[in-house]
Amino acid sequence: NGKRKFINSGELHYFRIPRSQWKDRLLKCKRAFLNTLGAYIAWNWHEEKEGKFNFEGDRDLDKWISLAEEVGLFIFIRPGPYICSEWDMGGFPNWLIPKDCELRSLEPNFMKYCIRYLDKVNKIIKPHLITKGGKIFLYQVENEFEVGDIPYHLKLKEIVEKDGIDVPICTNENAWVRGTDIIEGPDPYLRSWLISDAMIKIKDLIKTQPDKPPFAPEIGTCMIGWFYGQLPFSDGYRPPELDEANLKGLIAAGISGFNWYMYHGGTNIGYWTARNIATSYDFDAPIKEWGELGKRYYISRRIGGFLESFEEELSE
């Protein structure tokens, strides 16, 4: 929109929230001074059966995006095709298993199904792009690939651009793509008491990708216990004040935006959860699984108010 923005984003998943509660959760984000919604799209949520796409009811992606726009949020859209998200097969439909596909690769059989899926969701996304008067300003391909395969990532970029997606393309946790036309951002999760660990990631990003904005596609809230082992919160809990310190450290390190993961976790209904993941996806997030405002919400709101007040200075 021609103005510099500090991206203060929160991740919410329509596939973990009943449609009747979508607007309530989005309004709570807006009231905490968030300006952006981070949103995965789960392929298998829409193509549970091969070739039969469903975008109705709780799967109404267009309505989800429209509600975010209605409450005044920009949108950071993340269609994968792989999303992880502790979701069944990371979003891949299970009918891909007998297809003898090499997932997350340029293997032709996989790419055939991948292109069909992306074509479908991009038709919904395209009218909502900021270049078309909507609110989607950033589009992520893949997710936490970590170890390269630049041609695969560039092919995904080519596919979505062919579909008319003309906003910046990014990915996360794959430093190998730095130096290409894809914006790369780390996920500076805290796995110890040292907030300097996350700050080091951002400072390295600024140094190695100086021509692109230093953005973190995910910063963790409490996460889930087994991600952290025994250091130092084996029960999965950590003080909200540690997240506050981490956010302030990232801002001081020069970050231009971040996406809370999760801002509202919701619920893994039915059998959609990944292996070893509970039905609850609460995450001890700012907005609790049942919609109550947790301690992190008020921390986020204080920081959000600060970011909004000094956005121009912080976005230089």
Segments the model singles out, each with a brief description of its role:
Residues 4-8, 33-35, 69-75, 130-137, ...:
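Short, well-ordered coil/turn segments that N-cap beta-strands
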Residues 177-229, 244-247, 287:
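Glycoside hydrolase catalytic-domain groove-lining segments
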Residues 37-44, 78-88, 137-142, 173-176, ...:
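Short, solvent-exposed turn/loop segments enriched in Gly/Ser/Thr/Pro and often Arg
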Residues 51-59, 70, 81-108, 112, ...:
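Aromatic- and acidic-residue-enriched segments that line the glycan-binding/catalytic groove
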Residues 99, 110-140, 146-158, 164-166, ...:
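Carbohydrate-binding surfaces of carbohydrate-active enzymes
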Residues 22-88, 94, 156-162:
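Aromatic-lined substrate-binding rim segments of carbohydrate-active enzymes
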Residues 15-31, 240-248:
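Short, acidic/polar
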